């Protein structure tokens, strides 16, 4: 008699499926990576036109999050495309498992893909735009805000991509739903990232407030998405 498969084992199977598919096709990583490079080129052309008339350090926090958000949207839009094209969503739903396991596996896979692109794109951003500015001692703290922001983006984006997967204009609908929902997170992460990169007076207070709010957002939205996912995926 076969024993019941644990939720953790189901999670590993689903996560492994996503990772193996991506390693075989490179669809998400390639498209997200090329898009990130294109955004960096556009930023570079814009700053080249302005010359030294712009303070890149004070704009860097906002630019980093523009890069991350729109790159993540491209990946989230394809989060369930393989399952839809292969018509296997229905098959997964027939498996006797907690639907939240599907959500958690997709959240982690989306976070891994986004982090992989960030590991390449953010050093390129620094190389292109920040080398002319002396790095602040607080510079390493910006990693914390990027990590918290990426978790929140993946948590919310995974739920919303499930909602829009069958929509005719799913990419447009995903962006329309995604941006307003993550705006509070973006606001706090931009403030925290800018404070860490600039390192002005009292930067730690701004950074701490932003990180705490981002962490609270991640917890609330991840739990809410986890609870709602059963209803969303079964609708």
Predicted regions and their residues:
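Aromatic- and glycine-rich beta-strand/loop motifs that create alpha-glucan
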Residues: 1-32
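Transmembrane helix boundary and interhelical loop/hinge segments in multi-pass membrane proteins
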Residues: 22, 73-93
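Transmembrane helix segments
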Residues: 45-47, 160-201, 205-209, 213, ...
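Membrane-interfacial helix-loop-helix connectors in multipass membrane proteins
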Residues: 46-59, 122-147, 193-211
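Long, hydrophobic alpha-helical segments
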Residues: 60-76
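Selective transmembrane-helix segments that form parts of the transport pathway or gating/packing helices
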Residues: 99-126
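A structural motif at transmembrane helix-loop-helix junctions in multipass membrane proteins
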Residues: 134, 145-179, 231-235
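Junction motif at the cytosolic side of a transmembrane helix
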Residues: 218-235
